[in-house]
Each structure stands twice: as structure tokens, then as C-alpha cells.
Amino acid sequence: YSIGYMHHDPDRPRFFAYLSLFTFAMLALVTADNLVQMFFGWEGVGLASYLLIGFWYKKPSANAAAMKAFIVNRVGDFGFALGIFGIFVLFGSVNFSDIFANAATYIPAEGTTGQTVLNFLGYELDKQGAVTAIALLLFMGACGKSAQFLLHTWLPDAMEGPTPVSALIHAATM
């Protein structure tokens, strides 16, 4: 569909380069076996989305939409990055296999008192509080990328890009 739609656009090589970058970043995101690699794919998807939304950069509305998408996604990415850092502090690893293998040790036993395992924004968190805080930070990242609750304002503006971009971004965020 993109080939026919972009056939008469003189900048189609740039469009397909951005589209290839998006595809590469999405593949890096979904095939990652650790959180750092996943984060690089995550950021690549955000960068490629910014480039694709602002493809027609001579239109002020396309530039504004691209900047809005970029900034709102950075808010979610900040939460995601803090969540990854929290996981590293708790588990000492960012590999999914290590995290999943040790996750059961962070389920609080009945009747145990909370030992501080994480200091976050001046709060001393026990195991249960730390896992909850990390889950909320990761959720914040997911909300930013998938245009959910309060971080959704960029998605309607993404229609400023070419139609194939709008379809791709709306499908990728759902």
C-alpha cells in the first residue's frame, strides 16, 4: 500500500528509510531478551514514529504533531527507564530469565515485616512496595507508548503524517 501511495512523492526514499527504521526498531523491541536491548528498541520506535509523523516537515502542523508525539513519548519513556533501573537495583540483572527466576523471592511472606530494599524519591520501600512502584513505572511507560490515560494526546495528531504512517502508528500503539 505504501508503494502506491508514495509513488509520486519525491521524498519516497526518505519515507522508506524511516519505515525501515521503524520496522527494525520494532523487531529489536519484540525480540529482546533483556530490558536494555528492549529499551533501545523502544526508543527506536519512538524516534521512527517522530520521523514518520513529521515526514512532511514543510507543514507546520506536521512539525507540531511530531514534536508533540516525541515529547509525550519521552514522559512515558522516563517512567519506563526508571522502572528498568529499579529492576536492576532489586534483581541485579536486566535479563528476563534472571528476573523471572528470582521474581518469587519478592512475594512477601505472610506476617513478615518489611525490610527496606529500595529508596525511591525519599521513600524507603519494602519488597512489596518496591515491586509495586516498579510495576507502576513500567505501566507509565506502556501508557505513554500506547497512548493511554493522560498520555494519549499525541495519537490523534499523528494523522499529520502520510496515510500509511497513520495506519502503522495506530496499529502499533494498540
Predicted feature locations:
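...captures the hydrophobic TM-helix bundle architecture rather than a specific catalytic motif
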Residues: Y1-M174
